[in-house]
UniProtKB/Swiss-Prot annotation:
GO terms for molecular function: rRNA binding; structural constituent of ribosome. Belongs to the universal ribosomal protein uS8 family. This is Small ribosomal subunit protein uS8. Disulfide bonds: none annotated. Part of the 30S ribosomal subunit. Contacts proteins S5 and S12. It comes from Treponema denticola (strain ATCC 35405 / DSM 14222 / CIP 103919 / JCM 8153 / KCTC 15104). GO terms for biological process: translation. GO terms for cellular component: ribonucleoprotein complex; ribosome.
């Protein structure tokens, strides 16, 4: 079955696995997904991730992170720009996620970066998702 929005599918798999208390989740691999997951790791939302290969099909295994009370570090993860409704903003218009406690992930001409890094680099782009 083909997926019309693979990024939203990945975010949904991570959200569902985190709410179910799973240790890890596998998502189909792509360069864009790899970049998004590496930002989630650098921002402290996941423990780790690694590439898994089975019979030519590549997957990314994402190891989820939980706090002391065994609740997920990811309280919410939401797709902003979809294939049917693209959202582009300049660097001056980039919104803050939960008053700066969340992270905005933006696809820019300099690659996929956080909203904070996009503001510092003075580049706008397509809003991929927000995490808090």
């Amino acid at each position: 079955m083909s997926v019309s929005d693979p990024i939203a599918d990945m975010l949904t798999k991570i959200r569902n696995a985190a709410s179910a208390g799973h240790e890890s989740v596998d998502v189909p691999s792509s360069k864009m997904k790899w970049e998004i997951i590496s930002i989630l790791k650098s921002e402290g939302y996941i423990k780790n991730f690694k590439k898994m290969t089975q019979e030519g099909a590549g997957n990314i295994r994402v190891f989820l992170k939980y706090d002391d009370k065994e609740s997920s570090v990811i309280h919410g993860i939401e797709r902003v720009s979809t294939p049917g409704r693209r959202v582009y903003l300049g660097y001056k218009s980039l919104p803050r996620v939960f008053n700066g406690y969340g992270t905005l992930i933006v696809s820019t001409s300099k690659g996929i970066i956080t909203g904070k890094a996009a503001g510092e680099s003075q580049v706008g782009g397509e809003l991929i998702c927000k995490v808090w």
